[in-house]
Amino acid sequence: MGVGLHLTVPGLRRDGRGVQSNSHDTSSKTTADISRCPQHTDAGLQRAATPGISRLLGISSRSVTLTKPRSATRGNSRYHWVPAAAGWTVGVIATLSLLASVSPLIRWIIKVPREFINDYLFNFPDTNFAWSFVLALLAAALTARKRIAWLVLLANMVLAAVVNAAEIAAGGNTAAESFGENLGFAVHVVAIVVLVLGYREFWAKVRRGALFRAAAVWLAGAVVGIVASWGLVELFPGSLAPDERLGYAANRVVGFALADPDLFTGRPHVFLNAIFGLFGAFALIGAAIVLFLSQRADNALTGEDESAIRGLLDLYGKDDSLGYFATRRDKSVVFASSGRACITYRVEVGVCLASGDPVGDHRAWPQAVDAWLRLCQTYGWAPGVMGASSQGAQTYREAGLTALELGDEAILRPADFKLSGPEMRGVRQAVTRARRAGLTVRIRRHRDIAEDEMAQTITRADSWRDTETERGFSMALGRLGDPADSDCLLVEAIDPHNQVLAMLSLVPWGTTGVSLDLMRRSPQSPNGTIELMVSELALHAESLGITRISLNFAVFRAAFEQGAQLGAGPVARLWRGLLVFFSRWWQLETLYRSNMKYQPEWVPRYACYEDARVIPRVGVASVIAEGFLVLPFSRRNRVHTGHHPAVPERLAATGLLHHDGSAPDVSGLRQVGLTNGDGVERRLPEQVRVRFDKLEKLRSSGIDAFPVGRPPSHTVAQALAADHQASVSVSGRIMRIRNYGGVLFAQLRDWSGEMQVLLDNSRLDQGCAADFNAATDLGDLVEMTGHMGASKTGTPSLIVSGWRLIGKCLRPLPNKWKGLLDPEARVRTRYLDLAVNAESRALITARSSVLRAVRETLFAKGFVEVETPILQQLHGGATARPFVTHINTYSMDLFLRIAPELYLKRLCVGGVERVFELGRAFRNEGVDFSHNPEFTLLEAYQAHADYLEWIDGCRELIQNAAQAANGAPIAMRPRTDKGSDGTRHHLEPVDISGIWPVRTVHDAISEALGERIDADTGLTTLRKLCDAAGVPYRTQWDAGAVVLELYEHLVECRTEQPTFYIDFPTSVSPLTRPHRSKRGVAERWDLVAWGIELGTAYSELTDPVEQRRRLQEQSLLAAGGDPEAMELDEDFLQAMEYAMPPTGGLGMGIDRVVMLITGRSIRETLPFPLAKPH
């Protein structure tokens, strides 16, 4: 019936439902393990604990998370109090009846009111355990709003009212008797009226169960009780007449002593009444146990239910480490109406405990939770959840429950796991001890274990268990060796004599994870055995395809951790002390410390409930479900006992589910729409839906909308240049369609251009123009075959004789006239921009031409192209902030290169006299008109040359690139003209041929300042000049850095025509040789055009002693916190000590060269620049 055996009745909600709640007490994952919890962060859950209270307690607000969401129960009514009032009334009588049956003193104290109540109001015999048990069940059922309890109580009141009415009508009673009968009749009438008016408050049903089996048990117990009672009466008859002894015994055993004692002449000994009632109670208790167990067994998982759950796990089970435990067979299940999510649960003492998160599609979780809450309401259960993740708790909260964090689950990431380091010292020492004892570890899937060997494994697991029963509910599977669990993992520790001393069994967590289910060890196993198994599993996880391991759950982890911290508050210390005290029985602290030593990722899990006032009842349900409190005759099913499948008919009708519980065909589930079912279907715009519908019609007609390709004979440009009547086939995208009935015109575009195609019914080999119009949309890719001709207006056209669809466009293209106007949209959907924008395609072509021209120019001069590492152990070659990444294999940080310079110089040492690299570089800096964090960089080195040699070389590279992209050595510059028709933006060509100006840095700054400076100008003077010119500087900068700042603010940004600025201060050029004749400057130049630096060149520093001194200065800056300073690269310095020839080096930003040549920003010239996240 799902009614608890408790006598107390909880408080009431205003809406009339019994208060519902859940509190998760400690629960076991295995024999010695407390329940576990998992892997989402607690972001998104609101918290009620204030910072002040948190500080006072000395614990984090997360550990006392309480949320108060909207109510999930029925609305209020005028008679919401009736079930609780009826339950409390009957419960008080049940309690007093039980106490009177036990204690003669209480029986004497309540004798007078008991007799009055028994005679006129309600059956209240002096001693009867059976009647006390019946009333207790009735009180619990009334409180749970069971409709059958309402019917029983109403029938009792009606029958009592009829009896009182008959007595009143008969008359002849004393004044006291008349008063009692009239008062009783009035009370009964009022009770009947109240019960009838409160009928709708008793909505709860009773679950199906073995009613006839329970009745048979009661009947057998009753017969045995009557016979035994009759025998006792015969032995101790007292004053009871012989012919009344059997009836007296039957009245006390099965009649609940309801018959008037005056009907019997005489009495047996008083102690016999209690024994007779006890016999009746035993019969009822036995029947109730059979009924309750049958309710659970009959409504537990069926094979079809488990098969459906496994299908959902295969489709959606990658996120929840507890998902596989939903296949535990002593649970029941409720599905969302779509079948795409479900919740497994068990009912204990009137509490419906959901096991963790819903299983299935996250989008269908609210449906599943709603179905579960409706089920709880239907049967009058209090809803509760154990072990929900943050995402699951948020879903339950949105459905009206409250979330409380219980603790954290330990998650190991094998990619980050290592035994080295001081924090792993304890584990490392334990593993060493186990290995010295000769232990080895064997890891296998259950499917790879022979039946006889698995039988031995089960025997060992049972013999090593230190409790009488298996523990666990939400975080334990409850079975071992089942064929359906073939993917489970078994880890065994084996001694030198090939004897198994310990084992771990782990269930699948998606396809790449495992979750601990069972942990056993022999009493003879040495210390460190468990640590050895866990470490070996983590270290060899990659070979098993495992990327995450869920270990045990640490209940109240935050309390242990924060209560032990320095400065913890008194309440936090007291709370930790209580947990340590209770750890003597429930191993709370032991589990926390046993998990903590592996340095896991701690992930919170939550309990959810509806109202805090019944937390004790839900706590009792939790410990019963987890096995810490074992009820008599309880059992845990390892086979299917359910007879009533919960799978939605829509899913069951597919025939994909298996009666043995094995997983269904996942591809079949996808085909029947389980991945896109009712209620949460993919929402698409109307135009997209129309195109999807058209695609389905094409497929149903046998047309492949995405066929295998075949090369066309001509591009569009080639077709337009072909002779009249030439046979051609072209492929492209439909940009426009004009339908004139029997004749249809379309614009077809490929990379080379756009042309008109003409479909005339009279010239098509098969079909008609209408077929083309019906099958295609703008944006579709088609292949056209025919001959070249012209339309009536003389427009060159392809006269189509045949066509086929080669790619269905399922989304509409942007506006055919305006294209994509939003710059961000053009960046994010570059593929669309290229499809509709001819200028974007021209930029891609221009960029390709620039890259090709640069390579060809260098190849013509005998340069060798190489590739150097992008992932580097040190960041060097330039002063810039690097990107940092991490390599798991060696457990160390790496940097994305900011420049390939140091590796290319190693090649120069090796004798590669002319070398270049054209590749990607990365700098963790700003994003603007001319900067992108990822860019293309050219670095070239020529032996026996200097920086002046590269002035001509660089100019030649850029001019050749401009020639290749624009057809002439010109650069395109944006211009804005204002006229009568408004402002017009356009690009204007600028000639960049010939020789470009060369100026020294100090001369250019002097001209800008109007005051002469040189390399000998003092720092104080330079600072005064900065102040006068409004140029900012830092006090720690030297003179060279101040000069560079003046150059960037006054010279670089004002430069228009390409200009080489040479001879920079030595201090800002750490990899450049000093000038051969000028003190204080280095042989370096920067090329600037229109305010943007395009490249730089050095006479490379080849003196290894001076190079070491400069890099040591840079490393000191890096150690002092400068993120852009270069680190000391000993490998590079050692290579330099083998002597590098005099070399000139060039570095040039290809993206900026493309900007110069095309007149566009860096974001426009890159196919896919970095875009801000949505």
From Swiss-Prot:
- One GO CC term, this protein: cytosol
* Renumbered residue ranges of the record's region Phosphatidylglycerol lysyltransferase: 1-665
Cofactor(s), names only, from the UniProt record: Mg(2+)
Which residues are Mg(2+) 1-binding? Answer: 1086, 1093
Q: State the source organism's domain of life.
A: Bacteria
Task: List every stretch annotated Disordered.
Answer: 9-36
Among the GO biological process terms of this entry, one is: response to antibiotic
UniProt lists compositionally biased (Polar residues) regions at 19-33
User: Which reactions appear under catalytic activity for this entry?
Assistant: tRNA(Lys) + L-lysine + ATP = L-lysyl-tRNA(Lys) + AMP + diphosphate; L-lysyl-tRNA(Lys) + a 1,2-diacyl-sn-glycero-3-phospho-(1'-sn-glycerol) = a 1,2-diacyl-sn-glycero-3-phospho-1'-(3'-O-L-lysyl)-sn-glycerol + tRNA(Lys)
Described by its record, this protein's role is as follows:
Catalyzes the production of L-lysyl-tRNA(Lys)transfer and the transfer of a lysyl group from L-lysyl-tRNA(Lys) to membrane-bound phosphatidylglycerol (PG), which produces lysylphosphatidylglycerol (LPG), one of the components of the bacterial membrane with a positive net charge. LPG synthesis contributes to the resistance to cationic antimicrobial peptides (CAMPs) and likely protects M.tuberculosis against the CAMPs produced by competiting microorganisms (bacteriocins).
Identify this protein by name: Lysylphosphatidylglycerol biosynthesis bifunctional protein LysX
Which gene holds the coding sequence for this protein?
lysX
